[in-house]
Amino acid sequence: LRLSEQGYLKRTADEVWIPDERFFERSLSDTSVVAGLPTFISDVAADPFMIDQFLVNKPSKTILIPVQGDSMINVGINDGDIVVVEVSSTANNGDIVVATIDEEFTVKTLGKKKGKPVLLPANDSYPVIQPKGSLKILGVVIGLVRKYGK
């Protein structure tokens, strides 16, 4: 009962206990880490933080997809990363999208060439993809999850 009152657990309609939003909280420091020269931190406080609330605007339309390959490394998407994708059949020029092109599944930047949509890699070792047949947008990449180490 106490975990329910604090927002960690909730009951479903069929009386099953499941995790509620606060169950997934992590601590977020209110002090940023400097990526340049080190700075002195005298006291680091931490506030509750939920990754889903930070990354996901539309939970029912958001999926996670593992990345294989290195065609997007120049925009920071590496092999083994997980892209957070908001499902949508449309995207804007310049959006990083997950798409199917000629029955192939890929993550690339949506662009235009001679008025027609193309998929742009972020690695000079890969060519621009110009659809010979169909291009279908599955969704737009809105975030990224990466694990370091083991």
Where are these regions (language model features)?
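Acidic/glycine-rich C-terminal interaction modules and beta/coil loop segments
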Residues: 58-150
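Short, positionally conserved secondary-structure boundary motifs
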Residues: 2-78, 143-150
